[in-house]
């Protein structure tokens, strides 16, 4: 059925349902010919069964009639008007009034839409794609699915460590996992070797065309390289993580850059020896003449800076490279404080006038912010590992790199 014709009625007497239905059929018969005879329409399935609800009180009968219709809109409206025209039920006067014509299809559509919303809500809640979960699942698959235990020493390694002609040696399991995450499957860890490198590493390296030692950018990385070389492991190239960083925390971009900048063992050792030699030659004993560094401040003027470094200070400076630390001195080169490089700016911000700091030597970058703070706090000299982008140099602060200091 398409529609429900809903009517209210009132009869001025006590009647039953058959009386009401009989009045409807009797008073609408042949009004518009057999084509719109209600019984004929019911027989053809064009109208449904007539439902009557009755309430009687005080010699009156009231109620509601529902007539299901499968006719079109115009024909359904005509049937409603015909029933409204009924004015007697039995011997009693009666009034029939149309309440509404319900579109059953609209109700069905509304129910379908509401149900669809309910289904979608449940489905969305259960099936929503969470990118973090996807990444975690993929990462977990890399960790558990690709990492293997290689050789008699059961060392953490990538799945291609045996068949790839190139081998990357790292320190620990976490380093292997990180390289696997970025697609490097020819990697193996020595797993924290101290003094003795596993025989598995020595034997595997001999079979490879190229062997790369990829190590942390700290003192620990230096020690691992020494152990590898001391145990006669075949190493062709050395790659290092950025200073102060570990291989396990590098991004894919940082890994690519570190490997692109790798050096042969000979080149690497030569560079290290040159740096050590420069340090030894530059840091002379107390009896040597004062170090004189000339730096041009303008094209027309060269200002000479004379710095005399006591022997005990020289010994301290020798230990700074690679520590990411700094030392603050007073005007007489008495050490006031040893500090992490990352804390120097905050320390200067909190510096009071009665704290007599004149010189700062540190294993870090001299930045514009640090230079401005040093000027405001009347620091006379900053010596860093290198100088960053400086656009303005205060007149009351001199800046040098350790290279300047060592090669003067």
From Swiss-Prot:
Enzyme superclass (EC): transferase
Which CDD domains does UniProt cross-reference here?
A: TOPRIM_primases (cd01029)
Where the record annotates domain Toprim, the positions are: 165-243
Keywords assigned by UniProt, alphabetized: DNA replication, DNA-directed RNA polymerase, Exosome, Magnesium, Metal-binding, Nucleotidyltransferase, Primosome, Transcription, Transferase
Residues engaged in binding Mg(2+) 2: 216, 218
Q: Which PROSITE patterns match?
A: TOPRIM
Catalytic activity of the protein:
ssDNA + n NTP = ssDNA/pppN(pN)n-1 hybrid + (n-1) diphosphate
Output the Pfam families linked to this UniProt entry.
Toprim_4 (PF13662)
Q: Which GO terms describe its biological process?
A: DNA replication, synthesis of primer
Query: InterPro entries from the entry?
Result: DnaG_primase (IPR050219), Primase_DnaG_arc (IPR020607), TOPRIM_DnaG/twinkle (IPR034154), TOPRIM_dom (IPR006171)
Its cofactor is: Mg(2+)
GO MF terms held by the record: DNA-directed RNA polymerase activity; metal ion binding; poly(A) binding
Residues that hold Mg(2+) 1 according to the record: 171, 216
rRNA processing found in the keyword field:
no
EC number(s) stated in the UniProt entry for this protein: 2.7.7.101
Textual note on the cofactor: Binds two Mg(2+) per subunit.
Supply one GO CC term from the record.
primosome complex
| Role played | RNA polymerase that catalyzes the synthesis of short RNA molecules used as primers for DNA polymerase during DNA replication. Also part of the exosome, which is a complex involved in RNA degradation. Acts as a poly(A)-binding protein that enhances the interaction between heteromeric, adenine-rich transcripts and the exosome.
* Quaternary structure and interacting proteins, as annotated: Forms a ternary complex with MCM helicase and DNA. Component of the archaeal exosome complex.
Query: Could you say which protein family the record assigns here?
Result: Belongs to the archaeal DnaG primase family.
HAMAP family, sorted = DNA_primase_DnaG_arc
Could you tell me what this protein is called? DNA primase DnaG
Protein's organism:
Sulfurisphaera tokodaii (strain DSM 16993 / JCM 10545 / NBRC 100140 / 7)
């Amino acid at each position: 059925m398409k529609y429900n014709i809903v009517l209210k009625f009132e009869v001025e007497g006590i009647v039953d349902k058959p009386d009401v239905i009989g009045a409807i059929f009797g008073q609408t018969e042949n009004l518009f010919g057999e084509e719109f005879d209600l019984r004929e329409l019911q027989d053809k399935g064009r109208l449904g069964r007539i439902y009557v609800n009755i309430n009687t009180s005080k010699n009156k009968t009231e109620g509601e009639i529902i007539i299901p219709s499968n006719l079109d809109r115009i024909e359904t409206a005509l049937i409603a008007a015909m029933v409204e025209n009924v004015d007697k039920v039995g011997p009693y006067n009666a009034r029939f009034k149309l309440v509404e014509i319900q579109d059953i299809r609209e109700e069905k559509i509304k129910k379908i839409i509401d149900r669809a919303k309910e289904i979608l809500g449940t489905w969305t809640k259960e099936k929503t794609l969470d990118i973090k979960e996807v990444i975690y699942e993929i990462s977990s698959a890399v960790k558990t699915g690709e990492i293997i235990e290689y050789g008699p020493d059961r060392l953490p390694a990538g799945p291609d460590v045996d068949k790839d002609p190139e081998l990357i040696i790292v320190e620990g399991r976490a380093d292997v996992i990180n390289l696997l995450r970025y697609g490097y499957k020819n990697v193996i860890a020595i797993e924290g070797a101290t003094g003795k490198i596993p025989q598995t590493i020595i034997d595997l390296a001999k079979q490879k065309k190229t062997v790369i030692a990829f190590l942390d950018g700290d003192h620990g990385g230096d020690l691992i390289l020494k152990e590898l070389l001391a145990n006669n492991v075949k190493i062709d190239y050395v790659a290092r993580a950025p200073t102060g960083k570990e291989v396990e925390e590098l991004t894919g971009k940082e890994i690519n850059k570190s490997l692109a900048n790798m050096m042969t063992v000979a080149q690497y050792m030569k560079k290290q020896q040159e740096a050590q030699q420069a340090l030894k030659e530059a840091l002379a004993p107390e009896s040597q003449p004062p170090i004189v560094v000339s730096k041009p401040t303008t094209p027309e003027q060269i200002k000479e800076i004379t710095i005399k470094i006591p022997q005990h200070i020289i010994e301290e400076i020798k230990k700074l490279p690679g520590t990411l630390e700094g030392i603050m001195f007073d005007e007489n080169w008495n050490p006031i404080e040893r500090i992490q490089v990352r804390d120097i700016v905050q320390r200067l911000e909190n510096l009071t006038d009665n704290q007599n700091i004149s010189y700062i030597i540190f294993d870090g970058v001299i930045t514009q912010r640090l230079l401005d703070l040093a000027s405001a706090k009347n620091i006379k000299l900053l010596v860093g590992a290198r100088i960053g982008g400086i656009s303005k140099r205060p007149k009351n602060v001199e800046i040098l790199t350790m290279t300047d200091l060592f090669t003067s």
